[in-house]
């Protein structure tokens, strides 16, 4: 009986750990590097030098439906209006990382 309880406990711990681990984890530090090299010229500090009202600040992202990694990744991949498409220049992982970085920074009001 004691062995059965031990096996059950180990199985439960293993499943809990496995199920709580995300399928992928974005690298925010890499996202910061990608942002600095590709986005900061127009979006320094979460701003927007081309369209002043479409910033990367949390409120603007929410207002324009861009407050998810998927939405940001789509925009980076495909571009829109004055923003060029980066799909041919950045890898999928880099795009995922920069989206995570933007969301992370917007949650901190771009305060670092």
From Swiss-Prot:
Domain of life: Bacteria
Entry keyword annotation includes Iron: yes
InterPro entries with a match to the protein in the record: Cyt_c-like_dom (IPR009056), Cyt_c-like_dom_sf (IPR036909), Cyt_C6 (IPR023655), Cyt_C_IC (IPR008168)
Keyword Thylakoid: yes
Binding site for heme c: 39, 42-43, 83
Signal peptide span: 1-25
Pfam families attached to this UniProt entry: Cytochrome_CBB3 (PF13442)
GO term, biological process aspect, one: photosynthesis
GO MF annotations, alphabetized: electron transfer activity; heme binding; iron ion binding
Annotated compartments: Cellular thylakoid lumen
GO-annotated cellular components: plasma membrane-derived thylakoid lumen
The record's account of how the chain is modified after translation: Binds 1 heme c group covalently per subunit.
Keywords for the protein's UniProt record, in alphabetical order: Electron transport, Heme, Iron, Metal-binding, Photosynthesis, Signal, Thylakoid, Transport
Role noted for this protein: Functions as an electron carrier between membrane-bound cytochrome b6-f and photosystem I in oxygenic photosynthesis.
HAMAP family tied to this protein: Cytc_PetJ
Subunit structure and binding partners: Monomer.
Entry's family note: Belongs to the cytochrome c family. PetJ subfamily.
NCBIfam families: Cytc6PetJCyano
Protein name in UniProt: Cytochrome c6
Species annotation: Synechococcus sp. (strain ATCC 27167 / PCC 6312)
Organismal lineage: Bacteria, Bacillati, Cyanobacteriota, Cyanophyceae, Synechococcales
